[in-house]
Amino acid sequence: MKGRGGILPFLYKMTEKIILFTRVPKEGTTKTRLYNFIQPKQAVEIQIKLLKKNYGLLASLNKELLVFHDGNREDNDFMNSIIPADKFFYQRGENLGDKMYNAIKDVIEDGDKVILLGSDIANLSQNIIDMAFKNLNTVDIVINPSEDGGYFLIGMKKPIKEVFDLPSYGDNTVLENLITVIKNKNLSYYIGEVGLDIDTREDLLQAETGYRDIELLGAGEYNINFTFSDDESIKKVLRINVKSQMDLENQIEYEYETLQLLKNSSVTPKPYDLVTNTTLLPYKYLTMEFLNGRALDYRADMDIAAYLLSKVHNTKFEENNLICASNPFALMYEECENMSDKYLSWDKEDKKVSEYIRKFLSKCKELIPNEYKIASPCIINTELNSGNFLIGKSKEDSFVIDWEKALIGECEQDLAHFLAPTTTFWKTDIILTKEEIEDFLKKYSQYRDYDKERFERYLIFNCLRGVTWCSMAYREYSESTKLLMDEFTFNKISSYVSYEFLENISKYFE
């Protein structure tokens, strides 16, 4: 290369510039694909953490760093409260491709090497940046793919408009389309390390845990379960607690301790890890054994259920932090009274339904003992229904799951909840006959003794609990104060406050 004064030095050092592309973290526009998993405010907090971390890394590399955000001048003070940039630039263009091209075109000069990257990469490292600039010495374009089929970094020595004119930027064909354009233009390119761009809840979980192959297993109002593969490709469960039914601040720790206490039962999931300090994830979580099986069939699997419950109830336990209710009937009644108040105070109550509820409450109030001593204390689930069982090919290959509300109590409470009509009817249309209940208890008694009188008292209270909960939920769903997940749920709740159902279970309160 020749200049006015003759030949330039053999090594010509290009100026290395970094363009950091980011959104202004705002609720409603930031990480919106995470809103089915976390609150908008939490999504903003995650974006801010990633922006701070990645800006700090890039600022330490002694390159020219230019921050382009999607806001305007009014957003600069807020952005400055997050990162100490001397100046901000504004993204402009009709789409993401236009915005990236315009940014590179505006800052690149002869002799520059420019890379542009997003701000929310979980695994950004100095090596990624170093390799990008190094390879720009020998190729036209460098690319770092993201795991979702797109890319998070692109670098070049001159702006090339066609590279950014892709059909779309919102699907898994982005990288493929980009490479096609590059090849058609006869450009040389280098593909670097893959980055994790956090867009979905699976991305967030992978960034937090390092686990791979994360897939949703099941979600409820209080917990969300995912499967993942560990380093040895063994399938496990990641369980996240989002809210506590027991109003506990340490809900996931409580369930983890329960699983530890029950691990020798051989019929519950083995717990692995408990994580309470997280970097990005706003929830605590535990990992546990993945178990195969189907839901319990009340007509075919009662022998297995008797065996499983006895294994749980017969498990010896050491000193622990599980809640032990000294007078469970008083606590159950208080809970039921509070739930029933929601319906009984409703201006749209059905007078006849309210009459049934008051009758049931009155009967249970009479049955509350002044003093009560738990006999033969054991670990109980307290919420057993057909969905709490995973039935395999045999009783030894079957399990009891979901231990978020375990207590130290009496086996009769578990048995009564499991057999109560308000339980069996919830996920099925089955109400066990008196003979079927007695047959199950006979099978259970082959493994463990139970007290018939205590069982019958618990049975009545569990019927009350089911009815009062449904009456409360019926009002909440009717007023749209509770998110309705599906029509089946509302129809089932409605059936629990129907005259026919209430009359059918009123025999338990005679």
Model-derived regions, located:
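A glycine-centered beta->alpha junction motif in the catalytic cores
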Residues: 26-27, 31, 243, 277, ...
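An alpha-helical support segment within catalytic cores of ATP-dependent transferases
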Residues: 209-211, 317-382, 386, 392
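ATP/Mg2+ or Mg2+-diphosphate-binding catalytic cores
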Residues: 468-510
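Conserved donor-nucleotide/metal-binding helix-loop-beta segment in metal-dependent transferases, i.e.
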Residues: 124-148
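ATP-binding pocket architecture of kinase catalytic cores
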Residues: 221-334, 374
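Active-site acidic catalytic loop and adjacent metal/ATP-binding pocket
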Residues: 217-229, 237-238, 365-413
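Active-site activation/catalytic loop segments of kinase-like enzymes and analogous catalytic loops
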Residues: 413-449, 462-480
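N-terminal nucleotide-binding beta1-loop-alpha1 segment
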Residues: 14-34
